[in-house]
Amino acid sequence: MIRKMLQGKLHRVKVTQADLHYEGSCAIDQDFLDAAGILENEAIDIWNVTNGNRFSTYAIAGERGSKIISVNGAAAHCASVGDIVIIASFVMMSDEEARRWQPKVAYFEGDNEMKRTAKAIPVQVA
């Protein structure tokens, strides 16, 4: 059996640019990509916490240290500057691998200040 698992996640980053006329994609600060283990040109899902939109695109590297999150092309209709989003990538693996798998998660606050990284998502308390 093959399972689709969360590979990496940027939790609650803020959109800094939305460029309808750029070639598409989402430019992400290289430091953020590294923290979540997301590669340039990798498929990503973006979930807009601010307006509820959910869409897919691919990651491109933004300038390291710039804190850029630029939603480009047609996807710019789905996010505005200042929106809070979650960016995730996924990986396919065997059931055996999945049971040992730990995603890379980076948590953000304010103006894209990375507060911490983790290799697990905390259990949600009832």
From Swiss-Prot:
Modification sites for Pyruvic acid (Ser): 25
EC number: 4.1.1.11
GO molecular function, one term: aspartate 1-decarboxylase activity
Gene3D superfamilies, sorted: 2.40.40.20
Catalytic activity: L-aspartate + H(+) = beta-alanine + CO2
CDD domains for the chain: Asp_decarbox
Cofactor note: Binds 1 pyruvoyl group covalently per subunit.
EC class of the enzyme, as a word: lyase
InterPro entries according to UniProt: Asp_de-COase-like_dom_sf (IPR009010), Asp_decarbox (IPR003190)
GO biological process, one term: pantothenate biosynthetic process
Record's subcellular location: Cytoplasm
Post-translational modification (record): Is synthesized initially as an inactive proenzyme, which is activated by self-cleavage at a specific serine bond to produce a beta-subunit with a hydroxyl group at its C-terminus and an alpha-subunit with a pyruvoyl group at its N-terminus.
Subcellular location, principal: cytoplasm
A single GO cellular-component term on record: cytosol
Active site: 25, 58
Pfam families: Asp_decarbox (PF02261)
Superkingdom of origin organism: Bacteria
Binding site for substrate: 57, 73-75
Record pathway: Cofactor biosynthesis; (R)-pantothenate biosynthesis; beta-alanine from L-aspartate: step 1/1
Complex formation: Heterooctamer of four alpha and four beta subunits.
Physiological role: Catalyzes the pyruvoyl-dependent decarboxylation of aspartate to produce beta-alanine.
UniProt family annotation: Belongs to the PanD family.
Protein name: Aspartate 1-decarboxylase
